[in-house]
């Protein structure tokens, strides 16, 4: 870790705990995560009228979860789960919703019939997911991101 030497044991423990949390927060089939979730990984479904609406969807702020999983693997390669998860994310978008406009999704992949507000961010997220992916789609989004 790149922290002060006296803080490294704490940050190493925090990184390990964060990786374990993500295994709970990311959906077992799609790899998607909600914007907000409880400590047990369950999507936060309350207060849907606060902070602009629902936060139990794969939407906006949750894109960075997938991006950060890619970055964590690129820097540390500490857990092969990162690769498994990001392969699921890319498979979801490339097989389940191939050639469709990006929408808002529940983390199980259910489509919310509203357009994604940040489609370029979704392309960039899927490209960054490739840092921790080895599936058949890992190069597709990197070229898509370069085209944007």
Predicted regions and their residues:
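Extended ligand-binding clefts on enzyme/binding-domain cores
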Residues: 1-138
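Conserved small/polar residues in nucleotide/adenosyl-binding loops
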Residues: 141-148
């Amino acid at each position: 870790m790149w922290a002060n030497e006296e803080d490294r044991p704490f940050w190493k423990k925090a990184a390990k705990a964060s990786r374990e949390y993500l295994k709970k927060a990311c959906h077992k089939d799609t790899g998607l995560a909600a914007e907000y979730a409880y400590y047990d990984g369950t999507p936060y479904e309350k207060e849907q009228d606060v902070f602009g609406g629902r936060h139990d969807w794969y939407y906006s702020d949750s894109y960075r979860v997938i991006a950060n999983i890619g970055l964590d693997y690129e820097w540390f390669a500490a857990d092969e789960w990162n690769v498994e998860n990001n392969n699921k994310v890319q498979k979801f978008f490339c097989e389940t919703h191939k050639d469709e406009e990006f929408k808002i999704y529940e983390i199980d992949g259910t489509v919310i019939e509203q357009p994604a507000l940040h489609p370029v961010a979704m392309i960039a997220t899927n490209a960054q997911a490739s840092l921790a992916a080895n599936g058949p789609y890992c190069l597709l989004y990197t070229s898509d991101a370069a085209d944007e």
